[in-house]
Amino acid sequence: MNTEGASLSEQLLDAARRNNLDLLETVFDSLDNDPEKIAKLINESKEPLGNTALHLCCKYGSWEVLDKILDQDGEIEIDPQNDVDGDTPLHVTVRYSQEEPEHGTFIARNLIEVGADPRVRNYNNQKPVDLVHGDELDELIDLLQGAELAIDSTNGSGDNNEDGEMIDDGPSDDDEEDDKK
């Protein structure tokens, strides 16, 4: 992309698409490396489908640019939903993982470490873990499920199943006592 005449928003999105760290740093320099201005640009810049720079980094596996964005001091929105299907960057990462399992799992782990919420559902009522298909993605499934459990236990809602489903984890202690009688 020829950046001459391109807005900072367009340059940011292009840097995310192409994993172009030099372009990203040029954009940040144009904003005097001001964390508030950078965060505002990152949070408000969207392509026509509503994908942010975070979505694009996750879609194309642009780790260097994503890492630099996640390291910013400003208030970066980590779970924005795109306009088309309501996917968060974590949803997009799971889709990317179908083609690049190791790299996608690495990106997902880093998103979760900075606060991405694996419980967010898209417009099809799917959490990121619901998008996983394939035998080689067991590590990703474990990561997403573990992150959900960690959030639920931290919030004190580990006993509350969001969907209202009963989870059968085998015989209860009461059943075992009945069997002994």
Curated annotation (Swiss-Prot):
Gene3D superfamilies: Ankyrin repeat-containing domain
Extent of the ANK repeats: 49-78, 85-120
Keywords from the named record: Acetylation, ANK repeat, Phosphoprotein, Repeat
Disulfide bonds, paired cysteine numbers: none
Keyword Chaperone found: no
SUPFAM superfamilies according to UniProt: Ankyrin repeat (SSF48403)
InterPro entries for the chain: Ank_repeat_dom-contain_49, Ankyrin_rpt, Ankyrin_rpt-contain_sf
GO cellular component: cytoplasm
SMART domains, per the entry: ANK
Residue ranges, compositional bias (Acidic residues): 160-181
Modified residues (Phosphoserine): S172
Region (Disordered) location: 151-181
Modified residues (N-acetylmethionine): M1
Pfam families linked to this entry: Ank_2 (PF12796)
Name by which UniProt lists this protein: Ankyrin repeat-containing protein YGL242C
Natural source organism: Saccharomyces cerevisiae (strain ATCC 204508 / S288c) (Baker's yeast)
Lineage: Eukaryota, Fungi, Dikarya, Ascomycota, Saccharomycotina
